[in-house]
Amino acid sequence: MQRDELEQQLAQGVRRFENCAFDDEDLSRLDLQGCVFERCTFAEASLFAAKLARSHWLRCRAGGADFESVDAVDARFDGCDLNNSKWRRSKLASAAFHGCKLTGASFEEVAHLGIQFEECLLVGADLRGFSFRKATLKELDFSDAYLSGCDFREAVFEGGSLRNATLKLAKFQGADLRGASIEGVRLTEAGLFKGAVISHAQAAAFLRELDLIVV
């Protein structure tokens, strides 16, 4: 479906779209507030500055899509492929991502108060400066992610991974990391976990990096 067709549908009051292909389309600045997209494709599409507040995305594929400067407050994404999507300067307050693939996604300078990720792949994602303070993080794979300056204070990790993530200046005081994989964390970064709760196995892994034998 091309932009003009979508605009016609919206003008007629249509707010639900199923099995539509918007690949490579320029959908920038469209008002899609409250729309529902189910099993639609948006590969490499541009939604620059689109209004997506309260929209619902179900099992959509939007690899490489540009969501820069969108207003997606209270939007919900369920089971979507959003690999390598770009969200720079977007408004994502109270948005929810459940069961989504966000490998390589970029979240630079986003407004994210109350955002929720659950059972998501965030491998290699750029989440620098995000606050997850006091959040319960369920099955989030942050492997190789850019987490510099993130605030994980008092967060609880239920599964998931921080394997080989970039953690410079991240804060973990009071965080419960026992459920997460922290393999690959460099010893020089171990101080970041001061005040965090880790398991005996995780502590032993740190000691092995010092070439100490744990018995």
Q: What label would you give each PLM region?
A:
Residues 1-215:
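Tandem repeat scaffolds
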